[in-house]
């Protein structure tokens, strides 16, 4: 990333009127979790070329990452006022609406994508994550199926596989191991590309199939030996998940050290969800260190603009409840469980992690 940044800075110096290096450097800073620098670069890109829809979307997305929601809306409104529009902008507008709890605006973005190849599937998959966030797994699976079908119709099997493996990871986190395993197999059969393999490995590690996860890690290390984000973020995260599967919390914590500087960044993949912090929290739970675990899970609540609408964002409430229960703070534990149950008040009743949570909460009374 540092070398990339130097390249773009040299480009900027040699071609001061070119907006492209500012766009690229801004994206680079987002991956590095240097959001204020990303804002400055993207604003400069817009000054040099004010009719680039991607720059408005990038600026708004960066403000979302920073939880600066009013600034994000202003960036999106500026784009629309200039009659600039595309699927990436609508994706970011959707995420803003989610964080504001604006169901009508979320529906508007999904409706905008209807019938637009390449946009429709993206917005349907995003909606699937929102349904899962609220525990509506039957609806989530339906939206994921529709997203995959739309991507296949648009002749993009790799994208369809991405939505499939995203759904599989969701199932893994909720305790639906069989569905997760089926989803991983289907995604890899459809299109075993780099990003799909990364999330497949993570999902497999999360459901207790560390050997298969490690095999995929080996393939990724062999095929992408110089990929910075794989080496520093994703492979350590998958390795930590595999260590947790075997109960080796010390190794998991060590594995996650590499990801630490980048865990608040966007991780250059179609998911992020602050996984290193989530897994580190689970490692501390295994280590019987409730207070340290709670601090890690709290990161997901403090950085909702990064976690967005993935299930780890809502499960963080449950994990905080578990952490405080372990630490002996029953009042805080109960409050965290209640936060989780409030968000999942209309959840499908058969979700394994929900059943576990209810049983745990009953013992707190």
Task: Outline where the language-model segments fall.
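Terminal, low-structured helical/coil segments at or just beyond the last alpha-helical repeat
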Residues: 334-365
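Structural signature of alpha-solenoid helical repeat scaffolds
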Residues: 13, 47, 81, 115, ...
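Alpha-helical repeat scaffolds
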Residues: 3-10, 39-43, 69-80, 102-116, ...
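Helix-start (N-cap) detector for alpha-helical repeat units in TPR-like alpha-solenoids
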Residues: 19-20, 35, 53-54, 86-88, ...
């Amino acid at each position: 990333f540092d070398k990339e940044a130097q390249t773009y800075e040299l480009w900027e110096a040699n071609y001061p009127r070119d907006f492209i290096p500012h766009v690229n450097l801004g994206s680079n800073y987002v991956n590095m979790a240097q959001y204020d620098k990303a804002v400055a670069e993207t604003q400069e890109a817009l000054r040099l070329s004010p009719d680039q829809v991607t720059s408005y979307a990038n600026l708004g997305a960066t403000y979302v990452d920073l939880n600066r929601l009013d600034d994000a809306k202003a960036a999106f409104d500026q784009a629309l006022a200039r009659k600039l529009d595309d699927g990436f902008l609508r994706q970011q507008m959707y995420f803003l609406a989610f964080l504001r709890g604006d169901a009508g605006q979320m529906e508007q973005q999904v409706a905008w994508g209807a019938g637009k190849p390449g946009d429709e599937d993206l917005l349907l998959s995003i909606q699937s994550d929102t349904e899962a966030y609220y525990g509506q797994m039957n609806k989530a699976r339906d939206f994921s199926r529709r997203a995959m079908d739309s991507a296949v119709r648009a002749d993009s099997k790799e994208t369809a596989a991405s939505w499939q493996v995203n759904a599989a990871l969701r199932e893994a986190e909720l305790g639906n191991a069989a569905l997760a395993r089926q989803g991983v197999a289907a995604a890899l059969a459809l299109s075993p590309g780099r990003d799909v393999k990364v999330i497949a490995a993570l999902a497999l590690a999360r459901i207790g199939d560390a050997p298969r996860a490690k095999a995929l890690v080996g393939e990724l290390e062999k095929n992408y030996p110089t990929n910075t984000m794989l080496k520093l973020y994703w492979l350590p995260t998958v390795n930590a998940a595999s260590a947790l599967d075997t109960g080796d919390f010390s190794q998991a914590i060590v594995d996650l050290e590499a990801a630490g500087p980048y865990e608040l960044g966007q991780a250059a993949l179609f998911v992020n969800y602050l996984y290193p912090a989530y897994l580190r929290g689970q490692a501390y739970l295994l280590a019987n260190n409730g207070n340290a675990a709670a601090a890690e899970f709290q990161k997901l609540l403090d950085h909702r603009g990064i976690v967005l609408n993935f299930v780890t964002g809502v499960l963080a409430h449950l994990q905080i409840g578990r952490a405080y229960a372990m630490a002996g703070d029953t009042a805080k534990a109960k409050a965290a469980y209640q936060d989780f149950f409030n968000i999942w008040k209309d959840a499908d009743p058969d979700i394994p992690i929900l059943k576990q949570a209810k049983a745990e909460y009953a013992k707190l009374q």
